[in-house]
A protein has these predicted regions:
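C-terminal structured domains
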Residues: 469-471, 475
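Classical nucleotidyltransferase
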Residues: 449-456, 469
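Short, structured beta-strand/loop micro-motifs enriched in basic residues and often containing a Trp
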Residues: 458-468
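Electropositive polyanion-binding surfaces
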Residues: 1-452, 462, 477, 483-500
Length: 500
């Protein structure tokens, strides 16, 4: 059989076409882009609070180019004052403009390995709106007072002008927090220390309200200049990432409370409770692993966290997390507030990423209308339509990202055909076992026909496969030895066989 050469670029093109992703800008938008390139703003012309004296920093990944948030923290009497500055995209992108219509249509930026399809043109996302160090930038400011108990005591929102003091990476900040001299500026150091002190308080508050702690296993592809996969790197979630996450959650909560206080419609980020049917399915798999999940009532986040913490001690937390995640409802955008189950919050918006998420841009416009004493341009029906479209766009983008990841993993797996691995059964279905190998982030199928010289019956209630003669049982969590038999990137298919 002739081996078909794998092409990263052609696979990306197929994904773009399959998921109807738009990677080009039309003529009208290109004309607008030219205007932005020549536009010079006069900071004296706008009613903005000048906060350039504060040592804001951006903290992002090494490869980030669109810096849409900057943070600064200081002591305030016996509390903490957190400033979260978010790029003022709404200042540049007017409602129903050509760029706005295209951003609404895209809904989100789509992230592929080494390649991004942006929601906004680069002149905005990486230039005018990006909070690059040493440049005067327009922002929408969330100024939040947080008590020693981690609760928000008060908040203000206003238009502001900042100049970021430093572009830091998660690794830099994490190294600094681990007593490595990765940062030298005294004012920046003071800000980081304050942010970390606040983070520890917010972390305790998160634990107290029992927000679900999903530490999912993430990895990234190492791709060379020729777009060839040279390896896979496990991404360890750093404390610096969690620090920024907690600051963003605080700003998102404050934005939700601010809009609600001003009696305006909003576009909420909601996460419903899991259904009883999903809980029952999860409880069967968890029972096979030795965990008890109460399936007689609606599950609470405290119970989920207890199981996850216990699984970490037994070293099967990745499997347990994946089972629980499958039971969770999808988060959505809607003007109807039902709270956020996963974060254990009564009211939540997405406010902090208007460069890459359209709902955040909508929330910015609503906040700016309140600040500037203008009428809200979005009624409930408008927001409902935008929420539905944004949720669909998010799901479509995630599906595209997952599909390319699966194709790349299959291509990576071809290097290991014939190799034996230790593996764990992740899922039991009527046609076989889905397994994950220990040494690499590779998953695949052992077809039921290759399990042995007998007929295997799928007991759906117990979620097991059982041999009709030997009574051999296969269940979720079983540790087995496997051999990678074949991998077909075009079909996103990896097949294993048992090693006896």
């Amino acid at each position: 059989m002739k081996k078909i050469k794998f092409s990263f670029n052609s696979e990306v093109e197929k994904i773009i076409k399959k998921f109807s992703l738009n990677n080009d800008w039309n003529k009208n938008i290109n004309q607008d882009i030219d205007k932005y390139k020549s536009k010079k703003f006069n900071k004296k012309s706008f009613n903005r609070k000048d906060l350039k004296k504060l040592d804001f920093v951006t903290i992002d990944g090494e490869d980030a180019k669109d810096f849409d948030d900057a943070v600064y923290c200081e002591e305030h009497e016996s509390d903490w004052k957190l400033y979260v500055a978010i790029a003022d995209v709404a200042h540049y992108v007017e409602n129903n403009s050509n760029i706005d219509k295209e951003a609404r249509k895209r809904g989100t930026s789509v992230y592929f390995p080494g390649f991004v399809i942006p929601m906004l043109p680069e002149v905005l996302s990486n230039n005018l709106c990006s909070l690059r160090p040493g440049e005067d930038k327009f922002t929408v400011m969330a100024e939040i007072i947080i008590g020693k108990d981690g609760k928000i005591k008060s908040y203000k929102f206003y238009n502001a002008l900042i100049s970021s003091s430093a572009r830091l990476t998660y690794t830099q900040v994490d190294d600094f927090l681990n007593n490595k001299k990765s940062i030298t500026d005294k004012n920046v150091i003071k800000n980081i220390n304050n942010l970390f002190s606040l983070y520890k308080i917010l972390k305790k508050s998160r634990e107290k309200r029992h927000a679900v702690n999903f530490d999912t296993q993430e990895f990234s592809f190492l791709i060379n200049k020729n777009n060839e996969i040279t390896g896979i790197k496990n991404n360890i979630r750093l404390e610096s990432q969690k620090l920024i996450e907690e600051c963003m959650i605080a700003a998102n909560v404050a934005s939700s409370l601010f809009i609600k206080k001003n009696k305006s419609n909003s576009l909420y980020r909601v996460h419903d409770e899991p259904t009883l049917e999903k809980i029952e399915d999860a409880s069967v798999s968890l029972k096979n692993l030795g965990y008890s999940l109460n399936k007689t009532k609606i599950i609470c986040t405290e119970e989920i966290n207890k199981i996850i913490e216990l699984s970490k001690k037994k070293l099967d937390d990745h499997l347990v997390t994946s089972i629980i995640l499958r039971a969770m409802a999808r988060a959505e955008y809607t003007p109807k507030n039902i709270g956020h189950f996963g974060l254990s919050l009564k009211s939540y918006n997405h406010f902090t990423s208007p460069i890459r998420r359209y709902p955040d841009l909508i929330v910015h416009r609503i906040i700016k209308n309140i600040i500037e004493k203008k009428e809200n341009q979005y009624d409930f029906n408008n927001l409902e339509k935008i929420g539905t479209l944004s949720s669909e766009n998010e799901r479509n983008a995630e599906a595209a990202e997952r599909e390319l990841q699966s194709i790349l993993l299959c291509n990576y797996a071809t290097k290991f055909i014939g190799k034996k691995f230790d593996a764990t059964v992740n899922s039991v279905v009527n046609f076989g076992l889905f397994i994950a190998v220990k040494e690499e982030p590779i998953q695949g199928l052992i077809h039921i026909s290759s399990l042995g010289n007998e007929y295997f019956i799928h007991n759906e209630k117990k979620n097991i496969l059982i041999g009709d003669k030997s009574k051999k049982v296969f269940k979720v969590g079983d540790k087995i030895k496997v051999k990678l038999q074949s991998a077909f990137p075009s079909e996103k298919k990896i097949d294993f066989v048992l090693v006896k």
